[in-house]
Curated annotation (Swiss-Prot):
Coiled coil: none annotated. It holds the Pfam family EF-hand_7. Ca(2+) 1 binds at D21, N23, D25, S27, E32. GO terms for biological process: cellular response to hypoxia; response to absence of light; response to mechanical stimulus; thigmotropism. This is Calmodulin-like protein 12. GO terms for molecular function: calcium ion binding; mRNA binding.
Length: 324
């Protein structure tokens, strides 16, 4: 059966197979099979993939090896729809720089480092790259590549989506720069995450008007709902009524200054005195108000304007300065 394939076809299939054989054991799962076939221009449905697996997976272990895959591909030659992208596969559409950028952004939001992201994380990754998508768009993207229905996609699947959707993106509303363009260090990202968590009370990855109000009140500030909504709107690039982590970072990095230090200290304006306190992460175990310090300290560190420009160390002034 394999003699029906040309040497070039076998080479292409072998390269794709190796790419998606994650653990290098010489076999792939149904989900990996679907991703691999799309990478070489095929468009199998879930039913098609199940039929292929049933046909090739002779021992019923849920995987197929390369010889089995070659037999399936040879047998099904001439029965597939013409690939949408002619001679080039999806991966060929991306430059090395694009792949590097996508890999960095993917890694940034792969929170547990398992090589996959959820739909919610996909939304954040897309925005960090300056690509705005509706919830319906994101669901369609997930449905297309999440063949096993586990609610996650891996990096090769993500690359496929990026290649397929090139040229269909709107410019980000905030700024021409995206989150990845700022080339933040791991320490800077950690600082942003800690500050973001102060606002994101329920930990769902978004700051709502109510969560913003709660945090502001804890800092001694009271605003009307309209004022709080204005603050949300300034940062809400995709118009969903909330601030995601990437939106939060994009706003704040717009006025970022270099504040890295070997001790990873946080500058905190001492209330009513205008003096600078320094708190390291070791203070977390002490008696300091860590949440307030990290919120104000991180913001203080990344504001381009001098601290003396602020009338108070209240976070209201700080936050409004960020959004101005």
């Amino acid at each position: 059966m394999a003699d029906k394939l040309t040497d070039d076809q076998i080479t292409e299939y072998r390269e794709s197979f190796r790419l998606f054989d994650k653990n290098g054991d010489g076999s792939i799962t149904k989900k990996e099979l679907g991703t691999m076939m799309r990478s070489i221009g095929e468009k199998p449905t879930k039913a098609d993939l199940q039929d292929l697996m049933n046909e090739a997976d002779l021992d019923g272990d849920g995987t197929i090896d390369f010889p089995e895959f070659l037999c399936v591909m040879a047998k099904n030659q001439g029965h597939d729809q013409a690939p949408r992208h002619t001679k080039k596969t999806m991966a060929d559409k991306l430059t090395d720089d694009q792949i590097t950028e996508y890999r960095e952004s993917f890694r940034l939001f792969d929170k547990n480092g398992d090589g996959s992201i959820t739909k919610k994380e996909l939304r954040t990754v897309m925005f960090s790259l300056g690509k705005n998508r509706t919830k319906a768009d994101l669901q369609d993207m997930m449905n297309e590549v999440d063949l096993d229905g586990d609610g996650t996609i891996d990096f090769p699947e993500f690359l496929y989506l990026m290649a397929k959707n090139q040229g269909h993106d709107q410019a980000p509303r905030h700024t021409k720069k995206t989150m990845v363009d700022y080339q933040l260090t791991d320490d800077q990202i950690l600082e942003f995450r800690e500050a973001f968590r102060v606002f994101d009370k329920n930990g769902d990855g978004y700051i709502t008007v109510n969560e913003l109000r709660t945090t502001m009140r804890s800092l001694g500030e009271t605003q009307t709902k309209a004022e709080l909504q204005d603050m949300i709107n300034e940062a809400d690039a995709d118009g969903d009524g909330t601030i995601s982590f990437s939106e939060f970072v994009c706003v704040m990095t717009g006025k970022m200054i270099d504040t890295q230090s070997k001790k990873e200290t946080y500058r905190v304006v001492n209330q009513g005195q205008g003096q600078v306190q320094r708190h390291t992460r070791n203070d977390r175990a002490g008696g300091t108000n860590w949440e307030r310090d990290i919120a104000v300290g991180v913001a203080s560190n990344i504001i381009a304007s001098p601290i003396s420009d602020f009338m108070k160390d209240r976070f209201k002034d700080l936050f409004e300065a960020l959004l101005s």
